[in-house]
C-alpha cells in the first residue's frame, strides 16, 4: 500500500508539474500576444505622430511664408508712411507760407474756380486752399512728390 501511495502521490506531482507547465505556457503565450499588441499600437502611434509632424511642418512653412509676406508689406507701408508724413509736412509748410504771404500782402478774399467769371468772393483762402484759386497766391517753393 505504501507503494501505491507513492505511485498515487507521484502521479499527483506529475499532474501538478504538467498543469504548471501548461499554465506557464499559457502565460507566456498571453505575454507574447500582449507584447505583440503593444508593439503594433506603438507602431501605429509612431506613424500617426509622424503624419502629424508632417502636417504641422507644412503649416509652419505656410505660416512662415505668410509672415515674410506680411513683414515685407509692413516695411513697404512704413516706408510709405514716412514718405506721406514728409509730404503732408511739406504741404503744411506750403500752406503756412502761403497764408503768411497772404497776410503780409493784405490779400485774403479769393474767388471760387466755378464762380471766377462771376467774381463771387468766397472768403479767406486759408479755409480751403485746395478748392480756391487766388490771383495773389504764388508758390514760394517747388515741392516734388
UniProtKB/Swiss-Prot annotation:
Region: Leucine-zipper, residue numbers: 46-53
InterPro entries: bZIP (IPR004827), bZIP_plant_GBF1 (IPR045314), bZIP_sf (IPR046347)
Bias-annotated ranges (Polar residues): 1-11
Classification via Pfam families: bZIP_2 (PF07716)
GO annotations of cellular component type: nucleus
Gene Ontology biological process terms from the UniProt entry: anther dehiscence; cellular response to glucose stimulus; cellular response to starvation; positive regulation of DNA-templated transcription; regulation of amino acid metabolic process; response to bacterium; response to osmotic stress; response to salt stress
Broad class of the protein's primary localization: nucleus
Name of the protein described by the UniProt record: Basic leucine zipper 1
Organism name: Arabidopsis thaliana
